[in-house]
């Protein structure tokens, strides 16, 4: 017998067996169990019509319940088999935080109240405000700063004040060049000196009825200024002495 003939015989035998046993071959384990139960039920109650299993799960479940009740088999309450996936703890915490924040926002929107401060925000809120003295220390120190004059500078300024308590800009610049003091400082010094001494000096009269030297006016001081010896070693030349213009 050739190889092809053997293959044809095997195939025909397999087809014959499949045609003979197709009705008795269960599709799966559940179908085999169901067929066994139906066979037992048919032996006990041959008059009951057995329906073919329906594809619908609900109909199949009702059929099984009816079958169990007839057989007297106690049934346990069926629990719905739902897959419960356990979420990671981190995901649970984040979801709970989001839920709390959403509920807080909704409650605040409904009530119209201000939200409470968090711990970090509360700590920042408790910090003291910057004082005004810390913001501008330069201005306060600048306003309190005083110019310290040397003894020679003070004597020279006092002598110039005795000669003319109202020096103009040209005279102040000359005094600044001699003493090395800025002209604005010299102007302030003369203003302070006039505020302290001039009111008393103008109202003062000697017992003989003569006025004080300061009441003679600025013109007399200009004529006397040329004959005053220079404190800084630069005596003016008498031949070139002229009164300074006002």
Curated annotation (Swiss-Prot):
UniProt feature coiled coil, ranges: none
Site (Determines DNA-binding specificity): 191
A GO CC term attached to the entry: nucleus
Residues of the DNA-binding region: 142-201
Tissue localization of expression: Most abundant in dorsal-vegetal cells of late blastulae/early gastrulae embryos.
UniProt KW DNA-binding keyword: yes
Disulfide topology: none
Function per UniProt: Essential for Wnt/beta-catenin-mediated formation of the Spemann organizer and for induction of the organizer precursor, the Nieuwkoop center. Acts as a transcriptional activator, cooperating with TGFbeta signals to induce a program of organizer-specific gene expression and to generate an organizer with both head- and trunk-inducing activity. Activates the head organizer gene cer1 by acting synergistically with otx2 and mix-A/mix.1 through the 5'-TAATCT-3' element of the cer1 promoter. Also binds as a complex with lhx1/lim1 and mix-A/mix.1 to the 3x 5'-TAAT-3' element of the cer1 promoter.
Protein name (record): Homeobox protein siamois
Species this protein is from: Xenopus laevis (African clawed frog)
Lineage of origin: Eukaryota, Metazoa, Chordata, Craniata, Vertebrata
């Amino acid at each position: 017998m050739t190889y092809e003939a053997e293959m044809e015989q095997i195939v025909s035998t397999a087809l014959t067996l499949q045609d003979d046993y197709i009705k008795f071959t269960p599709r799966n384990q559940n179908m085999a169990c169901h067929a066994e139960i139906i066979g037992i039920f048919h032996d006990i109650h041959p008059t009951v019509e057995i329906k073919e299993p329906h594809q619908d799960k609900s109909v199949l479940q009702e059929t099984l319940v009816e079958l169990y009740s007839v057989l007297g088999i106690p049934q346990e309450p069926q629990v719905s088999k739902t897959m419960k996936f356990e979420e990671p703890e981190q995901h649970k915490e984040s979801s709970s935080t989001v839920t709390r924040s959403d509920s807080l926002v909704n409650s605040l929107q409904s009530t119209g109240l201000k939200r409470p401060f968090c711990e970090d925000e509360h700590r920042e809120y408790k910090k003291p405000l910057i004082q005004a003295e810390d913001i501008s220390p330069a201005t306060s120190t600048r306003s309190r700063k005083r110019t310290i004059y040397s003894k020679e500078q003070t004597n020279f300024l006092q002598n110039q004040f005795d000669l003319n308590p109202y020096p103009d800009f040209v005279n102040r610049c000359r005094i600044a060049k001699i003493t090395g003091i800025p002209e604005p400082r010299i102007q302030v010094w003369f203003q302070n000196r006039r505020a302290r001494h001039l009111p008393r000096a103008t109202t003062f009269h000697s017992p003989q009825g003569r006025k004080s030297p300061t009441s003679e006016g600025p013109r007399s001081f200009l004529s006397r200024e040329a004959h005053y010896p220079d404190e800084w070693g630069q005596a003016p030349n008498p031949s070139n002495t002229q009164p300074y213009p006002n």
